[in-house]
Amino acid sequence: MQCPSYQNTDSRVLESRAADGGRSVRRRRECLNCEFRFTTYERVETVPITVIKRNGNREIFSRSKLLHGLNRACEKTGLDASRLETLVEELELKLQQRSGREVSSAEIGELVLVELKQMSEVAYIRFASVYRQFQGIDDFVSTLETMNRKAGPGHLAAVG
């Protein structure tokens, strides 16, 4: 590693430890020439994930964009922001582990809905209404009835 002070490429590692939840390694180094100490981080290089939008356009996956959408859907539901951050991290990890580097926005939306359904029914409905482009009250009623059937009798209030 090149010394930022002397530009020498010879250094020794003084200390190494996991950082960023185990996704990187933090190393404290010392230049063998000038004894300047500096820190480096080593991370696995990830190939960007391309999202295929509904209209066919492609864009790079943006965790901040997804997190923003989740925060909007989960406003005033009592869900902790750290849970949403974890959801996005886990989703991104699943996408990185796939063999293909392209994923449809529809697939991302469905993966998010599976997780949201377990966290908050209100957040699920709010996210689904945007993601599935609900056009009116019938779309909400249909989704609620489907949830009610799958959850069993007496789970949700009667709809209709």
UniProtKB/Swiss-Prot annotation:
The keyword ATP-binding applies. It holds the Pfam family Zn_ribbon_NrdR. Residues 49-139 form the ATP-cone domain. Keywords: ATP-binding, DNA-binding, Nucleotide-binding, Repressor, Transcription, Transcription regulation. GO terms for molecular function: ATP binding; DNA binding; zinc ion binding. It comes from the Bacteria. One of its GO terms (biological process) is negative regulation of DNA-templated transcription. The keyword Transmembrane does not apply. PANTHER family: TRANSCRIPTIONAL REPRESSOR NRDR. Negatively regulates transcription of bacterial ribonucleotide reductase nrd genes and operons by binding to NrdR-boxes. Belongs to the NrdR family. This is Transcriptional repressor NrdR.
